[in-house]
């Protein structure tokens, strides 16, 4: 989770959760836990990663790996950064997609073939190193932990990028077994509770008939145990502490435990003020808990921070969509349309977000019986991308005015 390093969790696709992770901009490097290998550049790279500055983070991890070519932790850190950058680029990190009964998010843009090959190459390199060390000492807890991290990340890759679910499950189970063994050998190795806790929660949340089926192959889960393990990992101030908090945040939202989830966002936001995903999730949680006015204020705050340049070129326009959806739910159609229209004010909005905003704005104008404005919005949807689901809906609206 880094978020991933929720990414690092790898339990099927739950790990993709929200990549709210990459947290940090104004974070004090001294406040971060010690990452292995221990050297200043590693700390700086993690600060950039948590800051969602993936390119700079990757450059830093490349330098660390060049100085420590046989360090499994250095390999995994670089792998994490490249993987989460690709997940962010493909649009697989929308937290809302993990807040319902499905753990399977969507990849909205095709992955980069070169990045896919780089990820697989790093996985193979790390596993070769880890397996070699474990062949000499099967109880080497650091190598067991490192291999579990590699397997978890590969599970995330195969699940969310390759969409190969059986391979993802196999690697996720392997990661869990490695980290359970770590905890058997060294109960105080709290970092291992991230993967084990995530896997327990995911398995414990499956429908009963699926639980029975997976139990036949020796798999089980316990939602409360999973949450407890994530709390333990978050409080340990280890490598996975922030990651554990972010995964926990998503799971608490699924459990409708909004007050507890908000406590996490309140703790993370001041530390990691450039991570707009954390700030945006706070708005989502406020709305889910029925605090609409506070949610509206938060969405507007995120939007204004983005306009003021606090998030760089990250896609903070998601806040305008969230604001529009909230106002729409209150049947405040004029204000909702105005919020959706804000997305187009961003210099380079995400094309899919822009399509969603234009489609929603068109529907609001139809509700207000402003058909000419609605038609312009639907035409804009089709002109952005004429071959996806949003365009199909827009063409339907062009034939018949939308009504709620």
Each model region followed by its residue ranges:
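Alpha-helical adaptor scaffolds
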Residues: 241-254, 284-293, 300-354
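Short solvent-exposed coil/turn linkers within tandem alpha-helical repeat scaffolds
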Residues: 67-71, 136-137, 185-186, 237-239, ...
